Amino acid sequence: YPIHYLLKNKPDIIIGIEKYEQAPAANFANLDAQYFYEYARRGFGISPSNMKLLVDEDANLINSLGIISKWLPGKIKKNETELIIFFAGHGLASNDGKELYILMQDSDPDLLSRTALSRTELFKEIISLKPKSVTMFMDTCYSGVSRDEEILLASARPIRIVVDEQEGVPD
């Protein structure tokens, strides 16, 4: 089969947020999402009816939750569907660093648990749909600063990976 035939029915959720209501801009994130959409459509042959593109103002929490909770379940066939998710924008960690959040366009960095998308909850919801596979492109970091070094949240703590010296580095 040609690759277009194999990929055309893959559902894609593509989100890119440059302009935030309450956070500094994530430069070019909206363009990254639009380019990914075009690449998926033209390069992979994925049907626009199987793709949801949310950019800037459209990428608010309500719209994002609607796609994940209403649109996506109708597109997933258990153990058959291969899902693609692309996100470009800001992420933040909770003050204690235990929870990671994806900032939507209207998220308030001071009210993460109420206004941002929990990465853990997103993963749980996707796993509960039982797709065959999930490919995620997450162009976000959880450092608490933008590319221009603007602070997203005064109390934000960066997430760092620390190697346990006793365990060593895996082969």
Name each model-derived stretch.
Residues Y20-Q34, E38, L112:
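Glycine- and acidic-residue-enriched helix-capping/strand-helix junction motifs
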Residues G16, A33, V55, P131-D171:
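Active-site-proximal C-terminal subdomain of hydrolase catalytic domains
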Residues N9-K10, S47-N50, P131-S133, P170-D171:
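Short glycine-/polar-rich loops that comprise or flank the Walker A/P-loop
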